[in-house]
């Protein structure tokens, strides 16, 4: 009798619409219960039985129950699952398999089976890619996944690389394909094979894509020719190799090895500017005045060169600093190094006065054994030879940005707009509390940004600089010319690494159109989206492999008295993140390690400080001594403790 009763249906509808609901993200805990985080301020308790319906990170709608002043959430509807495609470790064998996702907050094994057509017999400990197929909030009885790809066996020494590349769905090896002959591009190539071009790289570099030649001119001027490898002389637009490069967008540099954007035959041989080999190049000739200004007579042209020497960063730096026993092989090469050092000094001073110069941070290099074991991690400071190449490349990229802007009005540009306008007032208020007065409007201009950066660089510590970083916008890749506030430049377009960046290949093709006086087609915006996404994935892959290797490297230091100097990089409610100065590893110091009495401790992300009993005990950018308390291999996390 109640079956089709409209009154009953109406009552049900009313009850449903009157029941309070909330949408948010599930946060799991180690204890079995969880929370529905609605926003930064509001969260609801999810009891353990209800947590069985959801997974950490799921975005859900839940019914909110109130009992005895306590609110709790009952998951009702799945908005967006946290897991779709993931990597994990297989448990069990053959007919009864489960997979544990490789994620610090997902501990439960998910029942699974191998997808049809996947010819691998999975064993305990195997690593696999899986895709979620069932979810309790979708009306299924339980979670269920399908194994779609075998990655490798459990104790493969190279697990960090293979698992990370599979996680981010990135290629494991160089692209297939060969380039048989150079294209006829209708370019007249200037013969510069007699000039003393040199390359400066790491000793192990095979893909040399830039060579330099300098010459003194009258009136204290200097000429610089930057010659860049020319892969677009071999790879036609729209060809199979071009399409593969477009998808990869960059060479992926991971600790220990790289996965090139182009076939190795091209990147490490045909296009590589090897010593004593004739190579086609795209070149830029520029004149620098006595104060380092790039004069207006910038010239881009096609050429052939023959590098006369493969020089190594450290050897060149030692020689210029009058240490070490390396000597240039001839007076002509020595003269090149001296002139290039002069150009570097002039350009460095010009950028210091008219643009912005980054503070030098060391690069950290992993030294690996045959089986991927970490033998050592060394900090490689940026020395004079690194700066010679850097200044030459920045100058060449400024030239390309100008020429593409003035001749075509488009290109592939690196654009950085400084501070987000929405943050300008908050930024000015924060700086004011530290005694720096800036105009909220002015700081959004290139000049205003540069002025502030110089004031911050003059501060005794980097504390204030670290505080304002969160107000900055991100750098973007754009087809429109625009300023790069981070470099303090009106426009910046890279073309100096075409072997390893697809955007630089595009700029090569555009510059060649300018050289030939032809019209060119504006690059499509989709390509900038693909490049930005690939850059993000490659960076995450580099970080993930690094975390794994750092955990391996520091495992035997856990629980010992070995001290490490560590810079505080971030402070949150739960504690502090620090970077070990000698090797670059990131470690976490939990709040209880800072002070035993929780009520006397205030960790403020907002202020970048830790206060104990009202006194500032630690702040971001402080360098403190720590020991390694624990290394958790399953999550690749390093827990440190301050030395008392």
Curated annotation (Swiss-Prot):
It comes from Escherichia coli (strain SMS-3-5 / SECEC). It comes from the Bacteria. InterPro entries: CSD, NA-bd_OB-fold, RNase_B_OB_dom, RNase_II, RNase_II/R, RNase_II/R_CS, RNase_II/RNase_R, RNR_Ribonuclease. GO terms for molecular function: exoribonuclease II activity; RNA binding. Keywords: Cytoplasm, Exonuclease, Hydrolase, Nuclease, RNA-binding. The gene is rnb. The keyword Cytoplasm applies. This is Exoribonuclease 2. One of its GO terms (cellular component) is cytosol. GO terms for biological process: mRNA catabolic process. Its EC number is 3.1.13.1. Belongs to the RNR ribonuclease family. RNase II subfamily. It catalyses: Exonucleolytic cleavage in the 3'- to 5'-direction to yield nucleoside 5'-phosphates. Involved in mRNA degradation. Hydrolyzes single-stranded polyribonucleotides processively in the 3' to 5' direction. Its main location: cytoplasm. Residues 189-516 form the RNB domain.
